[in-house]
Each structure stands twice: as structure tokens, then as C-alpha cells.
UniProtKB/Swiss-Prot annotation:
The gene is MT-ATP8. One of its GO terms (cellular component) is mitochondrial membrane. It is found in: Mitochondrion membrane. It comes from Rhipicephalus sanguineus (Brown dog tick). Mitochondrial membrane ATP synthase (F(1)F(0) ATP synthase or Complex V) produces ATP from ADP in the presence of a proton gradient across the membrane which is generated by electron transport complexes of the respiratory chain. F-type ATPases consist of two structural domains, F(1) - containing the extramembraneous catalytic core and F(0) - containing the membrane proton channel, linked together by a central stalk and a peripheral stalk. During catalysis, ATP synthesis in the catalytic domain of F(1) is coupled via a rotary mechanism of the central stalk subunits to proton translocation. It is a single-pass membrane protein. The keyword Transport applies. This is ATP synthase protein 8. Belongs to the ATPase protein 8 family.
Length: 52
């Protein structure tokens, strides 16, 4: 048990760090791409508006 619990804590913290880095990369990427709005409004006849 003492050898398994720090490894689970390490993997859990590493996955949390990976998710946070991925969320920040997506946030900066879409905040840079938002003034164009050509990626999102290709068809203006669609019902659904994809807003980030």
C-alpha cells in the first residue's frame, strides 16, 4: 500500500496538469481565432451557432 498510493497521486496530479495545459492552449488558440469568425460561420444557413 505505501508504494501504490504515491504513484496514484503522481499520476493523478500529472493528468490534472495535462488537462490544465490543454485547456489553456485551447483558450489562447480560440481567443486568437475569434476575430476572424470564418472558421465558425462558413454556412450561415445552419441552425446551430458554435460559440466558444
Amino acid at each position: 500500500m505505501p508504494q501504490i498510493f504515491p504513484m496514484n497521486w503522481f499520476l493523478m496530479s500529472l493528468m490534472i496538469m495535462m488537462i490544465l495545459i490543454f485547456m489553456t492552449i485551447n483558450f489562447y488558440f480560440f481567443s486568437m481565432k475569434m476575430p476572424n469568425k470564418n472558421m465558425f460561420n462558413l454556412n450561415k444557413k445552419t441552425k446551430y451557432n458554435f460559440k466558444w
